[in-house]
């Protein structure tokens, strides 16, 4: 399988690639991807969980037990649970968010999709998401998997990230550019 060397060159990319290969061999790619999405949501919502994975004072066994409990609460599959245990045993839990992102990119590339992250000041409705997905599909020529988030600090407009490309049409960026131009 051909994977971007940029993804696999990083530590998190190597872990994600290994997990993808295991999941692919066992036919669990979509199940593992769903598990990782649950974990990602839990990491975004829980400051305690985020603190747990970034705590360097936590021992391997403690981290493993804590993550096993989290995996049980989230209903994660056996492969994902074992993988998170390996990260805990290797003291690499802090890489988990990057591993999740890299796994998603690898899985999307395998399906011929491109992942796009869209940040807006307000939640987008279904029609806006559909229209944006179509525009991005026309621009890239590939199927788009859209992940949306809300950041009121951008004031308005959108910030779209597709792979290493970023399209920033936020009002905050425009105001910052105007302020810089006025200083010059």
Swiss-Prot record:
GO terms for molecular function: proton-transporting ATP synthase activity, rotational mechanism. GO terms for cellular component: plasma membrane; proton-transporting ATP synthase complex. It is found in: Cell inner membrane. Keywords: ATP synthesis, Cell inner membrane, Cell membrane, CF(1), Hydrogen ion transport, Ion transport, Membrane, Transport. PROSITE patterns: ATPASE_DELTA. Pfam families: OSCP. Its main location: membrane. InterPro entries: ATP_synth_OSCP/delta_N_sf (IPR026015), ATPase_OSCP/d_CS (IPR020781), ATPase_OSCP/dsu (IPR000711). It comes from the Bacteria. It is a peripheral membrane protein. F-type ATPases have 2 components, F(1) - the catalytic core - and F(0) - the membrane proton channel. F(1) has five subunits: alpha(3), beta(3), gamma(1), delta(1), epsilon(1). F(0) has three main subunits: a(1), b(2) and c(10-14). The alpha and beta chains form an alternating ring which encloses part of the gamma chain. F(1) is attached to F(0) by a central stalk formed by the gamma and epsilon chains, while a peripheral stalk is formed by the delta and b chains. F(1)F(0) ATP synthase produces ATP from ADP in the presence of a proton or sodium gradient. F-type ATPases consist of two structural domains, F(1) containing the extramembraneous catalytic core and F(0) containing the membrane proton channel, linked together by a central stalk and a peripheral stalk. During catalysis, ATP synthesis in the catalytic domain of F(1) is coupled via a rotary mechanism of the central stalk subunits to proton translocation. HAMAP family: ATP_synth_delta_bact. Belongs to the ATPase delta chain family. PANTHER family: ATP SYNTHASE DELTA CHAIN. This is ATP synthase subunit delta. It comes from Novosphingobium aromaticivorans (strain ATCC 700278 / DSM 12444 / CCUG 56034 / CIP 105152 / NBRC 16084 / F199).
């Amino acid at each position: 399988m051909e994977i971007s060397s940029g993804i696999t060159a990083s530590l998190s990319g190597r872990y994600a690639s290994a997990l993808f290969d295991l999941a692919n061999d066992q036919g669990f790619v979509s199940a593992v991807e769903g598990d990782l999405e649950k974990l990602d949501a839990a990491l975004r919502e829980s400051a305690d969980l985020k603190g747990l994975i970034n705590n360097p004072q936590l021992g391997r066994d403690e981290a493993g037990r804590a993550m096993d409990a989290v995996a049980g609460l989230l209903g994660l599959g056996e492969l994902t649970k074992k993988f998170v245990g390996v990260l805990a045993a290797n003291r690499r839990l802090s890489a988990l968010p990057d591993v999740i992102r890299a796994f998603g990119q690898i899985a999307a590339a395998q399906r011929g999709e491109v992942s796009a992250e869209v940040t807006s000041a307000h939640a987008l409705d279904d029609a806006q998401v559909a229209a944006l997905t179509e525009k991005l599909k026309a621009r890239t020529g590939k199927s788009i998997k859209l992940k949306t988030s809300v950041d009121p600090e951008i004031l308005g407009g959108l910030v779209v990230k597709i792979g290493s490309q970023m399209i920033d049409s936020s009002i905050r960026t425009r105001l910052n550019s105007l302020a810089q131009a006025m200083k010059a």
